[in-house]
C-alpha cells in the first residue's frame, strides 16, 4: 500500500488518538502529544462528518478537561491548528485554549 506523506501523518495521528482514548478509559492522565492527537482527531472526524468550522472550533474546547491531562499540559497548548477535509474541501481549523 502506497501512502502519501500526508496520509502517513494522518494515520500516525489517529493511532496516537486511539492510544490516548484507551489511556483515558483506564483512568490515566494524558500527556502533551496524546492530548494534541485526541483533539486533532476529533476535529478531523468532525470535518469528515460535515460539521462546520465554527462548531468544531467550539466543540474542540470540550474534548478534554484539566482533570484529564497531566499538570502543565493545558498551558503548553495555547491553540491547536488542524487542516481538515470537509465535504467542500480542506480548511484550517484553529481551536484556542483547547483544554479548559
Swiss-Prot record:
Name it: Urease subunit gamma
Query: EC number(s) in its UniProt entry?
Result: 3.5.1.5
GO cellular component annotations, sorted alphabetically?
cytoplasm
Report which residue ranges the record marks as coiled coil: none
Would you identify the family this protein belongs to, as annotated?
Answer: Belongs to the urease gamma subunit family.
**What biological processes does GO assign it?**
urea catabolic process
Per its record, the protein catalyses: urea + 2 H2O + H(+) = hydrogencarbonate + 2 NH4(+)
Name of the gene encoding the protein in the UniProt record: ureA
Q: What is the lineage of its organism?
A: Bacteria, Pseudomonadati, Pseudomonadota, Gammaproteobacteria, Enterobacterales
GO MF term list:
nickel cation binding; urease activity
- Keyword annotations for this protein? Cytoplasm, Hydrolase
NCBIfam families per the UniProt record, alphabetical: PRK13241.1, urease_gam
Q: How does it assemble?
A: Heterotrimer of UreA (gamma), UreB (beta) and UreC (alpha) subunits. Three heterotrimers associate to form the active enzyme. The apoenzyme interacts with an accessory complex composed of UreD, UreF and UreG, which is required for the assembly of the nickel containing metallocenter of UreC. The UreE protein may also play a direct role as a metallochaperone in nickel transfer to the urease apoprotein.
Q: Where in the cell is it found?
A: Cytoplasm
Q: Which Pfam families match?
A: Urease_gamma
Q: How is its activity regulated?
A: The apoenzyme can be activated in vitro in the presence of nickel ions and carbon dioxide, which promotes carbamylation of 'Lys-217' of the UreC (alpha) subunit.
Q: What pathway does this protein act in?
A: Nitrogen metabolism; urea degradation; CO(2) and NH(3) from urea (urease route): step 1/1
Amino acid at each position: 500500500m502506497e501512502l502519501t506523506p500526508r496520509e502517513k501523518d494522518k494515520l500516525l495521528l489517529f493511532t496516537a488518538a486511539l492510544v490516548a482514548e484507551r489511556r483515558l478509559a483506564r483512568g490515566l492522565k494524558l500527556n502533551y502529544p496524546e492530548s494534541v492527537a485526541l483533539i486533532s482527531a476529533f476535529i478531523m472526524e468532525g470535518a469528515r462528518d460535515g460539521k462546520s468550522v465554527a462548531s468544531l472550533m467550539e466543540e474542540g474546547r470540550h474534548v478534554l478537561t484539566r482533570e484529564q491531562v497531566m499538570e502543565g499540559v493545558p498551558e503548553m497548548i495555547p491553540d491547536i491548528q488542524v487542516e481538515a477535509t470537509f465535504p467542500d474541501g480542506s480548511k484550517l481549523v484553529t481551536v484556542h485554549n483547547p483544554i479548559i
